[in-house]
Amino acid sequence: MDYKTSGVDIEAGYKSVELMKEYVKETMRAEVLGGLGGFSGAFSLAKIKEMEEPVLLSGTDGCGTKVKLAMVMDKHDTIGIDAVAMCVNDIACAGGEPLFFLDYIACGKNYPEKIAAIVKGVAEGCKQSDAALIGGETAEHPGLMPEEEYDLAGFAVGVCDKKDMITGENLAAGDVLIGMASTGVHSNGFSLVRKVFDITKESLDTYYDDLGTTLGEALLAPTRIYVKALKSIKNADVTVKACSHITGGGFYENIPRMLKEGTHAVVEKDSYPIPPIFAKLAKEGEIEEQMMYNTFNMGLGMVLAVDPADVDKTMDAIREAGDQPYVVGKIEAGEKGVTLC
C-alpha cells in the first residue's frame, strides 16, 4: 500500500503547483523574498519604516457556500476573487493597504486543472488589490470530503500608519454616507440563496430577461474589491471618518459597526439602483424586506462617511478608481444604529 492508494496523490499536488506558478508570479511585489515552494512566505517590511507608527492589519475569511455554485457550474476561475475580496476589503475599510495573501484549499481529490483554476482566481483578486500571493496550501481529504467537492479560504495581512486608521472616532452628525456599488450578492447569504433557487446546472444556465444574464452568472459574479477606491480617496487628501464592508448581516449588522456611540446612520433606500438579482430573490423566496437588508448587501458593498465638504472629491476619487459611488444618506445624532427610509 502507498499514499496514493489511500487517496492522496502527491504527483497531482506537484502538477497543481506547476500549473499555478504563472498565476502566482503575476502577483509578485518587490517586497516578496524567495519564490513559491518554500516552507514559509517571506515579505520585507523595510518600506514601513517611513511610517510614524506602523500597524499591521489582518483578515481571514472564505466564500461560504458560494463554492457550491462554482462546483455545480463547473466554473472555478472566479471563486478565488471572492476569497481575496472578503479579506482585503476588511483591511481596506480600516484604512490599510493589503500586502500579501495566502490561500487554503481543502478538497476531496486533487484535480490539478481545477486547483489551478481556483488559484487563477485568487491571483486575480490579489492583482486587483495589489497584494502578493506568497503561499498557500492544498489539502486532499479522502474519506472526509466527496472527491468533486472543495472549500476555499484564506487570509491577508496589510499595514497602515496608526494616524491613518479609519476608526469612526471623529464621526459627527451631518457627515455624509457614500455607498459603493456591489456586483450583486457577493459572498454572503448563499445558504438562503440555495434554499430559494433550485441549484442545478440546468437552472443556473437558464437566461432571465430581468437579470440580463443567466441565473448562475448573476449569482457567481465575483465580489467587488474596493482597495483601489479607498486608496484613491486617500490620495485625494480626503479623510474617511468611518467605513463599513457590507457582508453577512447586511445593513443592519454592518453599518452600526462603523458608528461611535451617540451617532445614528440614516440610509435612503431609493438613493441608488438595486441590482435585479435581489428583487428576484425576494420574490421567489417570499423574503420580507427587513430580512433582505439584514442578510444581503442590497447593492452596496461598502459604505463610508465623510465630511460634507469632501463629498465631491470623494465621489470623483471613487470614479477614478473604476467604482460607482452614490450619496446614500447621512449621520445624525442619536442611538447607535441604522434607519432605512
PLM ranges: what are they?
Residues 22, 28-183:
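Glycine-rich phosphate/pyrophosphate-binding loop regions near the starts of catalytic domains
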Residues 16, 20, 42, 87-88, ...:
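Buried hydrophobic packing segments
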Residues 9, 61, 174, 245, ...:
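Residue-level signature of catalytic and energy-coupling elements of molecular machines
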Residues 13, 49-50, 63-66, 161-164, ...:
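Short, acidic Gly/Pro/Ser/Thr-rich loop/turn segments
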Residues 173-217:
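Acidic, glycine-rich loop-and-beta core segments that form the ion-binding/anion-interacting portion
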